[in-house]
Amino acid sequence: MSKKVRELYEQFPYPLRDPQEEKDRLLMPPMDTLSRVNHYGFAGRKNVDAGFRALVAGGGTGDSMVWLAEQLRDCGGQVTYLEPSQASTQVARARAEARGLVNVTYVNATIGEFAAMAPEKFDYINCAGVLHHLEDPEEGLRDLVSVLADDGCIGAMLYGEHGRLAVTEWRKMVALLLPGKDLNEQLAMTRSLLSSLPEGNMLLKMGGGPGFIKGLLENDPEIVDLLLHPVECAYDVHGVYDFAASAGLDVAAFTGFFGFGGTGKAHYSIENHITDPRILRDLMALPLRDQQAFCERYSAAMPLHAFYLTRPNKVPSVA
């Protein structure tokens, strides 16, 4: 992890969360719902009991950690929260304490540093919105595989290339304005630009309208993570499959991701996009990944990809 990325998350823990709100609500990221993990990652055959071990790799302010720990608290399962940012860890720990969660171990380290510790293997690894911020994402994935149980499952999220085009173009637009400015100055500039966006700007379309920009202007960590991150890359559907293969993994299924539309499993099914029977017949004759790649380009509305990864031939395919 680069020095700039470390500094960003120390200054702006992400996502913005208030531990006091744990008294009133529980955030439940669907990718980390254990019944779903069991279905797609283990064909429904995994016993989620006291021996179940989950790792949240790049836990941020704790959304996935809290939800996994809540699901495992009664059966005795354990969660390891891995995060290099002390500021983010402070928020995450406070959230867990507010809920009385005692089945969490906190580790302040990068993915590579943690893998080098050779910990006991994990049944499920969450790594959402992290690998695409590494200078070598494939190395990061290989490090995760090194701590994954033989029959384990990884739930990952990567930025989507086509649905994120508005952000890509924004980053190109402001690139010449960033040198010489510290992060606070970059943020002030970005807030000024966002406050007077032309009606045709692609960010408005990507976010669904003015309400998206209003929400951004009320959430500095979101602005920084979305528009000012110093290291990021994005993937199309074929890129996701190739990325998985680089670490010897299969894409078991695409799934939904908390807080975003257009990324559920149904959005990768051509039957949900195409009604012309002749076109549908031609598409159905293609390999699955080609069908899914068509859906991504046709919808142009997938800003990210959430998916489960397993080792080849470990899990029978499921619907």
Whereabouts are the PLM-identified features?
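Conserved SAM-binding loop of SAM-dependent methyltransferases across substrates and taxa
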Residues: T61-C75
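A short glycine-rich, Lys/Arg-flanked "PGG" loop and its adjoining helix->strand segment in the class I
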Residues: E138-D150
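Conserved SAM-binding strand-loop segment of SAM-dependent methyltransferases
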Residues: G100-E113
